[in-house]
Amino acid sequence: MHPAPTDTRPRRSSPWLSALLLAILVGAVGGLVAWGLAGVPSGSNTADPGEGADFGPSRIVVDTPQLRAAKDEAGIEPCAPGPGTEPAEDGLPSLVLPCLGGGAGVDVASLRGPMVVNLWAEWCPPCARELPIYADFHDAHGDRVPVLGVNWSDPKPVAAIRMLGEHGATYPQLADTEVALSSPLRVRGMPVLVLIDADGAIAYNRAVEITSLEQLEGLVREHLGVEL
């Protein structure tokens, strides 16, 4: 009695099995992507900046005759350096940012508080919603706690300046065209609120939408010790 011959031909995989494996693979990749996005730390109602910090060399120009005219029309105040002569411990790095709409650049390491710094962008809906609140804070408390805006990697600087004018935000504005603050401030979304104390140290840094003047006043009181 001879044993039954063994079939040595390679078995073909079933089409439905291949499709099932492909679906599992796609689902796993999608899950990892979703997990990564969900793990981004930010405050409520913040806008994702897109591809993160690696934008490559910037081609954004923030000083042209058109931008200077728009800045004058919006009534935006000129940029001014802070009193610091060297970077503060736990403060901003030595980094010169240009003034949005023309004017002298500022080394952010020179900034001393108490000061409110708002990173924002024209493409960010939460930023537009909170701009009037920063404008109100500037009008009410700017003599004691100055407000400084930092326009973050905005491809349309003229639209950004016009948006400031529409919301009455006249406080000085720097421009981070190279997203240079992305790493030191760990920027993961817009808008961002940074509070700087009298020594130049960062007392508060969070991606968060400010929804009321009282909220902003409370944060300044809590983290900078200023009674408003």
State where each predicted segment sits.
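A generic structural signal for alpha->beta connector loops
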Residues: 113, 144-145, 170-171
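Sequence contexts marking disulfide-bonded cysteines in secreted/extracellular proteins
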Residues: 76-82, 98-100, 125-128
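Soluble periplasmic/extracytoplasmic beta-strand elements of cell-envelope proteins
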Residues: 96, 149-151, 194
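N-terminal targeting signals for export/organelle localization
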Residues: 1-94
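Thiol/disulfide oxidoreductase modules built on the thioredoxin-like
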Residues: 15, 162-169, 176-228
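Short active-site neighborhood of thiol/selenol oxidoreductases, capturing the structured segment around
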Residues: 105-128, 134, 147
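Structural microenvironment flanking redox-active thiols in thiol-disulfide oxidoreductases
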Residues: 128-167, 177-183
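A short beta-strand-turn-helix
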Residues: 84-89, 94-115
